[in-house]
From Swiss-Prot:
Interacts with the capsid protein (CP). Part of a MP-CP-viral DNA complex. This is Movement protein. Keywords: Host membrane, Membrane, Transmembrane, Transmembrane helix, Transport, Viral movement protein. It holds the Pfam family Gemini_mov. It comes from the Viruses. Belongs to the mastrevirus movement protein family. GO terms for cellular component: host cell membrane; membrane.
Amino acid sequence: MDPQNALYYQPRVPTAAPTSGGVPWSRVGEVAILSFVALICFYLLYLWVLRDLILVLKARQGRSTEELIFGGQAVDRSNPIPNLPAPPSQGNPGPFVPGTG
């Protein structure tokens, strides 16, 4: 190479690394991050909305929400607890004195 023309020649430097022929790692990372964000969004949606919606829909089918919370056991409605009248009040019973029964 002529020293006078050396200023006009640039060294040959590759502009990009050769591809390995597989899926680029940036694409794998992108899919992993988007999947993780979608999973978190679905979980928060379940916590804030879907869980209450499921309880409301099941309660409309004739089961109370208490029955749903304490399990899927059927309640025995054939022998309900009777409504008993309250015992008669005795008026003002007075101050509490320990040991007097």
